[in-house]
Amino acid sequence: MFIVIEGGEGSGKSSLAKALGDQLVAQDRKVLLTREPGGCLIGERLRDLILEPPHLELSRCCELFLFLGSRAQHIQEVIIPALRDGYIVICERFHDSTIVYQGIAEGLGADFVADLCSKVVGPTPFLPNFVLLLDIPADIGLQRKHRQKVFDKFEKKPLSYHNRIREGFLSLASADPSRYLVLDARESLASLIDKVMLHTQLGLCT
């Protein structure tokens, strides 16, 4: 089972991933928590280069292919082996983040980026079983991030950028509602977990 958690900045992806993982471990399930970009040694090094480039200005296309390179390695090295071993894999961000951030917000084109995302996984289609979209007004999400007082380059973008991010995620969910569970990220973590467990109960039954 492959579950992806998506959402804009400050939506609580890491908190939901950990809480969901804890819930499933308590049910004696094997769980792997991971993230993108990152999730493996090469991926984490690319993450550092993308999010905090050392006095470098990455072009939009260079940045896109760094994300895709991280994903290609992550899928082959971590995600597929874990799924084969019977793990439930919970990943913070996947294809949709790339389509929304690089395709929509950065202006490279959603269809162009989606096509590249489909190719980077190889000849066999590889999509999550469930996409959990944490939706939150961009200004509230940024307020949450500002409390942390440490920002990557995307979190430093203007509010208009983050509004495009939110609209992009919602447009993807609206276009393919069977793939998504859209959650109000302002709700309590306990409420979110209840909704996720209800939504996924058939897929997660032993």
UniProtKB/Swiss-Prot annotation:
Q: Which E.C. number(s) belong to this protein?
A: 2.7.4.9
KW GTP-binding (keyword) present: no
Which PROSITE patterns does the record match to this protein? THYMIDYLATE_KINASE
- Gene Ontology CC terms, in alphabetical order: cytosol
Sorted keywords for this record are: ATP-binding, Kinase, Nucleotide biosynthesis, Nucleotide-binding, Transferase
Q: Which HAMAP family match?
A: Thymidylate_kinase
Protein's job: Phosphorylation of dTMP to form dTDP in both de novo and salvage pathways of dTTP synthesis.
What is the name attached to this protein's record? Thymidylate kinase
The record lists the organism as Chlamydia pneumoniae (Chlamydophila pneumoniae)
What gene name is given for the protein in this entry? tmk
